[in-house]
Amino acid sequence: MKCENCTKTECSKKKKTEENGEILDAMALADGEEKSEFHQLAEAKIFLSDCLACGNCVTSEEGAKIFAQNQKELFKVLNRNKKCDSSLHKLVVASISPQSVPYFAVKFHLSVCEASKKLCGFLKSLGVHHVLDTTIAADFSILETQKDFIQRFRRQTQDEHAFPMFASACPGWVQYAERVLGDSVTPHICTAKSPQQIMGSLVKGYFASSKNVSPDKIFHLMVAPCYDRKLEALREDYYTELYNCRDVDCVLTSGEVMQIMEQQNISVKEVMEFPLENLFGETSCVFVRHEGTSSDGYLAHVFRHAAKELFDMDVQEITYKALKNKDFLEVSLEKDGETVLRFAAAYGFRNIQNMVLKLRKGKFHYHFVEVLACPGGCLNGKGQAQTMDGKVERALLHEMEEVYTRVPIQNPESNPHIQALYEDWLQGAESQKTKQTLHTKIVASAQSAARLDMKW
């Protein structure tokens, strides 16, 4: 089985090109590291991140930069802070993805809240100065996605690309759309940044200003469930030339952080507990999540908002209908006997392939689709819930889903700091600064144009 649009006789995950794979393998062996995202492809299986790691999409330069995002990069900064003159020190800030915390909860045999405190304590014991909750970044991403949907709905008669609208939070999906699917798909993707990159903007922008620190004097670490987040952090539009720094300097997966704990032979019981901070220096013992799926619930939030904003309907309960498989779900809204909204969630490469095929045939009649590269969503990220040969650790995934559902829900609109940041820092919810800070450009690459005529 091969990726759609792939012209190779053998997958580059098995037979790597000299330019990309062999160089990276040599680097890995020289450093005594595992090969991480460049592992062998599981037989008869294709994952979206495997496709993205093919030499046709990821250049050797990108591959080297992805590989360099490891614990050595973190410890290089931490050790420099201990040994060098204070003028060369960096403020080390770690942002924790909400989907990573359930992984540590299961591994530590603790509640999500307790696990977040242990994780915070461990990172601080290494020399990290601030460990931040990223809920506010997901709040902004959801709210901006809601706004984008309403605007598209109101201009749909003038814009042939208004619908379906695809969520943009998954970097694997966005990279695949830009580099392979091209401009037949990219105009349909929401321009709101992912929570990771909004957090990057907040840390290198608002947080840096509040601490009176230049953005290039902050080392921003992101702990995430997914290897594709490493590639996302390298996007050109997330780099600031003025300060010669990226919004997110290093991404470590949940599994990589756990490896650091194991290598240092640290017992969870020995780790002191510290609550996560927010951008304002406040701490809370309560860990919250968003309604809907474990991937921040874009479908649920956009659906409820659209029902109220467009049709003045309050949706009390959302009913998900599984179609061909459990990773393709449908939600619809009826008014006066007519279906006025049709939403879907499409997880995994196979469902993405089917979705795009129907879109090109004009048979994909949805208003909004929550698209994720990993089957089962972000909890099933390859950086925490999958083995190196691509097999899902189902028991672990099930436990993570169980603990995640016990976390209390908070709607983005309920976050008291959101409106303050819109008004005081972003100069208004509709300002140019808001668009520059919270949105990105989804652009088809030159490579994709050559592939549009290929058969599906």
Swiss-Prot record:
The record's GO molecular-function terms, alphabetically, read: lamin binding
State where the protein is found.
Answer: Nucleus
This entry carries the following GO cellular component terms, namely: lamin filament
Q: Which domain of life is it from?
A: Eukaryota
List UniProt keywords, sorted A-Z: Nucleus
Pfam families named in the record = Fe_hyd_lg_C, Fe_hyd_SSU
Report the family membership: Belongs to the NARF family.
Name of the protein in question: Nuclear prelamin A recognition factor
